[in-house]
Amino acid sequence: MNSVDPYSNKVRVRSCGLLIFEGKILLVKQNVPTRMSPVWIPPGGGVALGESAELALKRECKEETGVSLSGLRLRYVHEFIEKPYHALELYFLADRFSGEVIKGSDPEHTQSEQLIHEVCFMPFDDLTMLNVVPEFLVDELKSGRYLQSQISYFKSDR
């Protein structure tokens, strides 16, 4: 069994963080089961049974990046469908953070199965040169639409 099997053949709820600071967004370069090469994604991960989406995001962000988030506001709902994967992703804007950015790890994986390659604040201007997923985020960030107050829904299927 490979390390991506737990994510397939079910609907997975993920909580993700959009931490923007001085025209840059915090991103994690990591392996994902639907791509052949690593991608840049906002920090986040699965919501456990009985865990709130906000608490899941705070836990995942701390594990992956060393950063603690606060002042969370739901901004995007993204539905991702690519058989055998199906995820509902909740993207929260964070207005405050504490801690130093580090390359963290995922306690669900052994040391040899770690997915994270790099963690950094990436300038908006550099996003089009990177493999950022979900793809809608690049336009939302560069256009400033991420600052709007309503919750927006996006769907990606391949």
List where the protein language model places each region:
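Acidic, metal-coordinating catalytic segment for phosphate/diphosphate chemistry
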Residues: M1-C16
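Unchanged
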Residues: V47-S70, F80-V133
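A cytosolic small-molecule/anion-sensing beta-strand core signal
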Residues: F21
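Nudix hydrolase/Nudix homology domain
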Residues: R35-V39, H109-R158
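Conserved S-adenosyl-L-methionine
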Residues: L72-Y76
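Conserved Nudix-box catalytic region and its N-terminal flanking loop in Nudix hydrolases
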Residues: K24-E63
